[in-house]
Amino acid sequence: MKNLNLVALPHFVSVENLKNDEVKALIKRAEYFKKGGAVARLTSPVYVTNMFFEDSSRTHTSFEMAERKLGLTVIPFDPAHSSVNKGETLYDTSLVMNALGIDLEVIRHSQNEYYEDLINLKQHQKLNIGVINAGDGSGQHPSQCMLDMMTIHEHFGHFKGLKVAIVGDITNSRVAKSDMELLTKLGAEVYFSGPECWYSEEFDQYGKHEELDKLIPKMDVMMLLRVQHERHSGDPNEKKFDAHRYHEKYGINHKRYEAMKKDAIIMHPGPINHNVELSGDLVESDKCMFVRQMENGVFMRMAMLEAVLRGRKLGGLE
């Protein structure tokens, strides 16, 4: 019998269409795993491959750990030695993986919404593979977003009315876009700060842009973003970038740390540039959730992967 309290999805590529009760159910499931709850027993093998076309330490390793904890069979994939370098398209690569027996593929790619070509059932008849988005260009990062929601919920127990500031290179951050969308949906109040050259008016629908020092005393969550230098090709502001000046204007130093609310927290998706977004000796401070976010990432990705297993009825799960 299908468990109505568990989420079932054919793919996990965005947070856009997630219902609030699905978000909360995924958080609850991830918390269950974190407490040592037993994973569902697979009655048949499930094969997954991690296709990372952009650099990754946390997300790649976290997904593989989650996959192994769930009992999935992980098949290695190295983009540097794949036929992509011979001109093979991502779609054709996925078609090959599917034909070889791969059930799920976790993909990180520089192209925004790369997944649309892989999940469009009307367009393709022979590709039938589950897709989990591990980050698409500057578009979405659903797994980071979900582990962020888990971390916030774990600390505060709710979302409604929480004040969250997203600070940094917002335009180029897929984490920011996923988080602002879901936080707003869950009832949090979103604010922005950082260089105006890396902020777009399209974000005004989620919150307002303010000076950092005015925001800090009011915020429950300070969500810091690194400057996405790799996405600044042709951006004249990149040549003017000065790490020391950035830290002085937009970074969390000891003075700003002390100005935060007693129960407020600092979050960062990583990698952290020490003494740019955050003073290096504050990375492991009491308010900083960086390590906890990484820890929670494994359990949330277990919940997300399990949701797709159920949605596709893989391994005997429904």
Curated annotation (Swiss-Prot):
The protein's annotated pathway: Pyrimidine metabolism; UMP biosynthesis via de novo pathway; (S)-dihydroorotate from bicarbonate: step 2/3
Catalytic activity from the UniProt record: carbamoyl phosphate + L-aspartate = N-carbamoyl-L-aspartate + phosphate + H(+)
Record-linked Pfam families: OTCace (PF00185), OTCace_N (PF02729)
Positions annotated to bind carbamoyl phosphate: 58-59, 108, 141, 144, 270-271
Claim: Transcription regulation is one of the keywords in the record: no
Keyword annotations: Pyrimidine biosynthesis, Transferase
Known partners and oligomeric status: Heterododecamer (2C3:3R2) of six catalytic PyrB chains organized as two trimers (C3), and six regulatory PyrI chains organized as three dimers (R2).
NCBIfam families xrefs: asp_carb_tr, PRK00856.1
Protein name, UniProt field: Aspartate carbamoyltransferase catalytic subunit
Organism field: Lactobacillus delbrueckii subsp. bulgaricus (strain ATCC 11842 / DSM 20081 / BCRC 10696 / JCM 1002 / NBRC 13953 / NCIMB 11778 / NCTC 12712 / WDCM 00102 / Lb 14)
